[in-house]
Amino acid sequence: PELQAQFDGFTAYTNVVSTGAYTNFGTPALMGGYEYTIDQINLRKDEKLVDKHNEALKMMPVLFDQNGFDVTVFDPIYANYQWVPDLSVFSDYPDIHRYITFGAFESDMIPKNWISANMRNFFGYSLMKACPVTVQSILYDNGNYNRSTVQTEEENYVEQTISGPHTATGMDATFLKGYHALTHLPTITQTTKSGDNTFLFMTNDTTHSPVLLQAPDYSVSGTVDNTEYDSENADRFTVDGKSIVMEEGDQFAHYDSNMASLMQLGKWFDYMRKNGVYDNTRIILVAD
């Protein structure tokens, strides 16, 4: 019910498709328009793909900047073909504000815990492979390698092990890096009475790292068990006679990550409403 109110007025276009199966194929056309579809990009054979990708990323921010808008860019995906976007692609436009929000709100302990967990898993993997095949699945333990369940929340927030369609332990640190950028949107948003036009281009990878979350509020938890809730609310996957298949843990994880993202965006929209700057006709939500 809350989402219906928060997203009231939006139009969902379901008859659309990405121009490519991967981000480096889908993003250019999404950001730059028809001139950056795969066939058009391929016509420029003497130019590097990275240069054409950067052009597409800059298309809207630069146009708005040149027309008097105050422009901000968050995490321009694959900028300069770097996994961590290279913000220098906007160096010719000093008035464009650019930031990396992915992982900006994480504890300093997360990287250390990630390294520690991987080192332990490498050792566990070696032991598993040295054992007879008949016992390897027991030692593997769905990727836990029989890890003790007695851990602090922060220690447990490195990776998630999905043990069934409705249960999981741990939490994926990559998911948290994107998710916490969404939860902080009201905090990092500033409203003014200047009346200046603004443009924000934001990439967020929360839905790119599917995890199981604790229903019904889809909150982050080191131990997730939605068995009872999913059983009692199985009808929520059918709307207007159309159903989505929800049988495997991965399917529920994708659903949960999308729900969590929409809920945080809804809270941000409420923040904008409260401050008198909300206009959904100027908000576009897309995926590549």
Where are each of the predicted segments found?
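Active-site-proximal alpha/beta segments of enzymes that process anionic O-linked groups
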Residues: 2-238
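Metal-dependent active-site segment of extracytoplasmic phospho-/sulfohydrolases and closely related
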Residues: 1, 258-288
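Active-site-proximal segments of metal-dependent phosphoesterases and phosphodiesterases across multiple
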Residues: 244-264
